[in-house]
């Protein structure tokens, strides 16, 4: 007799926008979707099998963009802008991982309305696996502004 155990994988992020003087001008707390490819990546890492993209397959990059489409089956942001940034990950409890990333001045190179963010295992947009994605109402990021993102992935 086999037994099936279901562990939900959920995500939540906090986005803080700072102006050029370091003053907090916006803060958002947003739930997100852990996409199918992200769940499959977790499965493959546990099994030690599957095709793992990236140097080690570790989720360690964040990206921002503009777009509202996509969902559970998404594998990329709708319109990624700027350069992906390194996301430092650390265990925060027995079942959660915290990622920290920051999009500083000139990333992207001009003022942009940001409406989506993603968590990936590679620095380039054309390869790799997306773990999680979220959309939100527009954050108008000025060229000199910084977006600081704290992303929590919880299993179980």
Predicted features, each with a name:
Residues 1-115, 122-156:
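Small cysteine-rich, disulfide-bonded extracellular modules of the LU/uPAR three-finger superfamily
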């Amino acid at each position: 007799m086999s037994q099936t155990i279901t562990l939900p994988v959920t995500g939540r992020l906090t986005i803080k926008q700072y102006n050029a003087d370091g003053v907090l001008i916006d803060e958002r707390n947003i739930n997100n979707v852990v996409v199918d490819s992200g769940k499959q990546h977790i499965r493959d890492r546990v099994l030690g099998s599957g095709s793992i993209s990236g140097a080690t397959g570790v989720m360690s990059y964040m990206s921002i963009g503009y777009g509202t489409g996509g969902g559970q089956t998404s594998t990329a942001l709708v319109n990624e802008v700027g350069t992906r940034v390194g996301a430092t990950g650390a265990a925060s409890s027995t079942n959660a991982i915290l990622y920290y990333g920051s999009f500083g001045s000139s990333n992207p190179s001009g003022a942009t309305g940001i409406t989506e963010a993603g968590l990936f295992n590679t620095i380039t947009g054309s390869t790799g696996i997306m773990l999680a994605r979220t959309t939100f109402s527009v954050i108008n990021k000025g060229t000199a502004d910084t977006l600081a993102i704290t992303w929590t992935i919880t299993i179980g």
